[in-house]
Design a protein with these regions (language model features):
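Nucleotide-activated chemistry modules centered on ATP-dependent adenylation/adenylyltransferase
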Residues: 1-265
């Protein structure tokens, strides 16, 4: 069987590709996402998609980017209502997928939105059910994100340098993501202010944090290793004797619900 597959982004295609191959299902892709804003972000996501195409050599049908199509689709809803806005957006993309599928002779369609941890499967299935009746086409359903697929997909993207976006796509989700980031940052600063008695701003989100050169280890002994969780450096270089006191091993370490690469010297 070969299906017409709407692709929302490269990371979600990674999950869908694996499940489809496991079920011996071939697919033609349709990267249709006029919701993505700004255009530079659209280009980054499309380039990531093309990178996967180069790796897996799948068929593709394309259509020009037109952000106005998304804006028109959400005119009747309150854009601040994320659930209603997203439903309209998904409907628009899935309906366009069905139209293109029929135009190209396909009788079955699906979408990588089923891979996304952000999307509600019941909403997707309800949309699909309506489109099946309206256009006389079949929808292929599979829980692409099941069985730890999201974690495995993230590892694949990291190893293969596949771009992973930080927000859903539209300008409204960009603002929402930025607001969440700001709230998280303020919360971290508030916690750190109780742990550290100096200006720690420059130590937050560092690419490389050296202990004891950048951070006096006394703070770790006084406030606990969770100080690192709130500083969130990408990589930590730590003296062996300090690491031993906290039972830290060379490589990936989990501190609370946060993971970091720690190099012991």
């Amino acid at each position: 069987m070969k299906i017409f597959l709407h692709v929302c982004c490269a990371p979600d295609l990674v999950l869908a590709h694996k499940k489809l191959k496991e079920n011996n299902i071939e697919y033609t892709t349709f990267f249709y996402n006029p919701n993505i804003y700004p255009f530079e972000e659209y280009e980054r996501r499309y380039e990531a998609f093309l990178k996967l195409k180069g790796m897996w050599n799948f068929d593709e049908k394309s259509i020009d980017y037109n952000h106005k199509e998304f804006l028109d689709s959400i005119k009747t809803v309150d854009v601040k209502n994320e659930q209603k806005r997203c439903y309209k957006c998904m409907y628009m993309r899935m309906e366009k997928t069905v139209i293109e599928a029929k135009k190209n002779g396909y009788n079955v369609f699906s979408t990588t939105l089923l891979s996304s941890p952000r999307k509600n499967h019941e909403d997707i299935k309800n949309i699909a059910k309506e489109l099946e009746k309206r256009y006389n086409i079949k929808f292929y359903y599979n829980n692409f994100r099941s069985n730890n697929a999201i974690s495995e997909g993230a590892k694949f993207c990291k190893i293969n340098n596949i771009y992973r976006q930080q927000y859903c796509g539209c300008e409204y989700s960009l603002i929402e993501a930025e607001n969440i980031r700001k709230k998280s940052l303020e919360k971290r600063k508030k916690v750190l202010s109780k742990m550290l008695d100096f200006d720690f701003t420059e130590l937050m989100n560092k690419d490389l944090l050296k202990i004891p050169e950048d951070l006096y280890p006394g703070y770790l002994y006084e406030s606990g290793i969770e100080v690192l969780k709130y500083l969130k450096p990408k990589i930590i270089i730590m003296r062996r004797e300090i690491a031993k006191d906290f039972n830290i091993k060379n490589g990936r370490n989990k501190i609370g619900n946060w993971k970091s690469k720690i190099i012991i010297v």
